[in-house]
Amino acid sequence: MDHDPKERLLLPPRAAAAAAANGPHRRAAPAAGGGGGGVAIDVHGLKRRGGGRRSWVRVDAATGASEAVEVAKPALMRRLDLPARDLRLLDPLFVYPSAILGRERAVVCNLERIRCIITADEALILRDPDVAGGGAETEEAVRRYVAELQRRLVDRADDLPFEFIALEVALEAACSFLDAQAVELEADAYPLLDELTTKISTLNLERVRRLKSKLVALTRRVQKVRDEIEQLMDDDGDMAEMYLTEKKRRMEASLLEEQAFQGMGNSGFGSSFSAPVSPVSSPPASRRLEKELSFARSRHDSFKSADSSQYSIEELEMLLEAYFVVIDYTLSKLTSLKEYIDDTEDFINIQLDNVRNQLIQFELLLTTATFVVAIFGVVSGVFGMNFEVDLFNVPHAFEWTLVITGVCGLVIFCCFIWYFKKRRFFPL
């Protein structure tokens, strides 16, 4: 008995109630005879969290209606032919960088706070509160994404496929979020850096260090989104793979055409019994006619497929190029901010080097003055020895000794200063 694939994704009320009663946060009962103070780990709850049901918001492509559903990972894998590694990108228990993956029947998007699976008929947006970025912020981002997607589905006037509209809204949400963070970081950074150039303090240096850490993390995220868009733009096969509506239409047309040819074959086979034909000339003629019709049909399909693929690739490429310009502008702002921080660091290092040079010059002057003073110490030490010196009996000998020693010390000090300036140890 066949079931609607949408019904397989929705949980029955009893299953949802059982999942809520036996959720991953339920504490396991202690074993009999064991101590009552220990806390047991609910291994089955962890297994259910890793591979169980997730809360999603489903947006229908035809009507734009949204509803909250709980979808099991195995059901998604079976219905959309997605490998487990693709769904792992959307798992809130793991931290993965931004990624856009085009598959046979779906497009998997992990763009900042928007994690969704887009098909030709619907979009499933993950609204789990454990998603990185905070439960309330993620819930608000999902709500805005759904509202914007519904608005564009209602107001759309062009023939843009649903998957491109959903992808465009996701790219716009990610680019706007990253650009807002970049603007906020710029508003905090430039005044702080200007203040640091005039007043170097430990507090300002610590604030700049934290700001630079935020800048590096944000630049890495923006660079990843930019690389994903650029990688898609450089690969025509990946862009053609993301044209889900066209692939679905071709598949339906191929099935109808196959059924029509099977019906024609059956009717032709039935009529061959009622009318006598020549046993020699008829089968080769019918086979030749069949080959010509098949060849003409295949050529027509190939030409139509090539034209449609080229159109879809150009359409998607223009869409991606628009947001590539936006994210590249955000990256250029962050790069300019990083260069400004580097220039400020260089300026501070120059200032510190200048202060260090001044301290070295002062130390050199102090050392030279100490050497000159040491000359007085030598003279006083010589005259302080306990032996007879005839100079002690000469009138005014003490005054002349002080004058001559001072003049000699001053001359030696001036010679040192002249030498330092000649060797450019001191500024002229």
Swiss-Prot record:
**Superkingdom, according to UniProt?**
Eukaryota
Pfam families the record matches = MRS2-like
Per the record, membrane topology reads: Multi-pass membrane protein
Q: Where in the cell is it found?
A: Membrane
Provide the alphabetized UniProt keywords. Ion transport, Magnesium, Membrane, Transmembrane, Transmembrane helix, Transport
The keyword Membrane is annotated on this UniProt entry: yes
Q: Which InterPro entries match?
A: CorA_TM1_TM2 (IPR045863), MRS2-like (IPR039204)
Q: Name one GO cellular component term.
A: membrane
Q: Is Mitochondrion one of the keywords?
A: no
Q: Where is this motif: Required for magnesium transport activity?
A: 384-386
Query: Which example biological process does GO assign this protein?
Result: magnesium ion transport
Q: Which terms does the record give in the GO molecular function aspect?
A: magnesium ion transmembrane transporter activity
Against CDD domains, the record matches this protein to: Mrs2_Mfm1p-like
Looking at the UniProt entry, the stretches that span the membrane are: 364-384, 400-420
Similarity-based family: Belongs to the CorA metal ion transporter (MIT) (TC 1.A.35.5) family.
Name the job this protein performs: Magnesium transporter that may mediate the influx of magnesium.
Q: What is this protein called?
A: Magnesium transporter MRS2-C
Q: Which organism is it from?
A: Oryza sativa subsp. japonica (Rice)
In the UniProt record, the gene name given for this protein reads: MRS2-C
